[in-house]
Regions:
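Positively charged n-region of N-terminal signal peptides that target proteins for export
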Residues: 1-4
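Short active-site oxyanion
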Residues: 38-40, 63-64, 96-99
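Conserved helix-turn-beta segment immediately C-terminal to the redox Cys motif
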Residues: 54-74
Length: 159
């Protein structure tokens, strides 16, 4: 092989390794605010990314209770808590009288618990690439929405 081809391969490996390494969600220092809270996660038994998100919560200091439910039961939990369907994700977390829908970064949870807004919860819709518990690279800023009484109140924050 010629030197240019070998150099190209080496640079490619370094480049893709750097993307993989730097995209990993860094663990924040455990927040004492989180250690006193019980996060209750509703998820289906077959969801692998939910398991990764639960590990993320635990690594950030949360005490986590997992409730595995059927798809229908999970949908009912979302409906009973008036989470708009267009903001749904694969799991729902309840903590401190709020719901947290989706693969939410701890920065948003910290803001929610610190500011204590008069809302029912926050949502990061769908399952964005690179969000906590999800594989891939972050393709765009995460838009997190406030919800009250079944209504999307707009942007809570962007990360």
């Amino acid at each position: 092989m010629n030197k240019s081809l070998i150099l190209g391969i080496v640079i490619g490996v370094i480049f893709f390794s750097a993307i993989y390494f730097f995209n990993k969600q860094p663990l924040t220092q455990k927040n004492p605010l989180f250690s006193e809270l019980q996060a209750v996660v509703y998820k289906t038994p077959t969801c692998g990314c939910c398991k990764e998100y639960i590990n993320y919560l635990k690594a950030n200091g949360f005490s986590v209770e997992v409730r595995e439910v059927s798809d229908e039961e999970l949908e009912n939990v979302k409906k009973q808590n008036q989470i708009p369907a267009d903001l749904w994700s694969c799991h729902t977390v309840f903590l401190n009288n709020y719901f947290v829908e989706g693969h939410m970064p701890v920065e948003a949870i910290s803001k929610l618990l610190t500011e204590k807004p008069n809302i029912n919860g926050i949502a990061l819709p769908k399952m964005p690439s690179g969000s906590p518990g999800m594989p891939g690279i972050k393709l765009y800023p995460f838009k997190i929405y406030s919800v009250k009484d079944g209504k999307d109140l707009g942007l809570f924050m962007e990360i």
